[in-house]
Amino acid sequence: AYGTPLFVRRIRPNGDVELARGGDEFFSGIVLTDAARADGRPILAGERYGVKVRSRAAAASCTVEAAENGSVTLRFDEPQRAPAPGQAAVLYDGELVRGGGTICEML
């Protein structure tokens, strides 16, 4: 009906869904909620990880830009295609899972 692929860009607090058209699906970063490390240590600004937003995707290199109260902002080294709100983001150090969170916003 729209003539082009659409994807969820943002889910607003009131439940409204913001869509975006194909071609606008590359993002330079994501914000996670309920973010935590598997070992219980805090996620700190400046740390580097690989992050996967799809289980079969290669991990994308990123830097923690900000981390506070379970909210973590990650900035990708290279823009990434179509992360979406509600998806899990898993943080890696090489092959080791270090933590993760739920995507709430794309940057």
PLM feature segments, named:
Residues 1-107:
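AMP-forming adenylation/ATP pyrophosphatase catalytic core
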